[in-house]
Amino acid sequence: MRPTRCCAGCSFDAVGDGAAKKATGVIQKYRGRALLVATGSCAINCRYCFRRHFDYGAENAAKGGWQEAVAAIAADPDIDEVILSGGDPLSLATHKLVELTDALRQIPHIRRLRIHTRLPIVLPERVDDELVYWLGSLPWPLAIVVHANHANEFDASVDAAMARLRGTGAQLLNQAVLLRGVNDSVQALQDLSERSFAAGVLPYYLHQLDRVEGVAHFEVDDTQAKALIAGLTARLSGYLIPKLVRELPGDPSKRPL
């Protein structure tokens, strides 16, 4: 049962996933890209999750052996990038991921694969020999977008996992969420950018909080967010500055702030 609405301006579907449904477990918001909800499972419960009310039971691309999801992508030649998301796709057994990508290999218009995952940060042991072999065998240029919000999430085991991922030829990027009381200072953001880059991960996005029900206490207003980026820009090289963005339903891309 969904909770009673308690946040003015909040929503159970803050980013418009429902309206962007292309098939069971397939979401397409932006031209040329399709997001495949591979699973509803995650290694941890992120309290600010924008899909906290998402119906993973009904909207799971693994249902029916991926057939509906893969067919929907195959039927649209404008899709040249597939994003594996969830949940966390790396929470699936590697043989299930092989099954999925074997099906995607049959689609000639796919040119890139992207994986959104938090597991290399919170469970670096997941980056094992079998996973590394699978990643290295993929036929597409690969981007792995990890998710760390604070420099303290990195340690030697995470560094080792990132080194193994880089060894597959993947481009490693980090996306973070700006969270009140967690990383809402210039110093915290600087530490995060520097620490992620030291691990071989390029800062990518700093998301403004998606206003889903139950997370408003983490919100940082846009004025402060922009001031934080200005402060960060005064301290760091440009390649260490993540893009400050907000996702709004119906927009053709993430909205820069």
Feature names for model-found ranges:
Residues 227-257:
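C-terminal accessory regions of radical SAM enzymes
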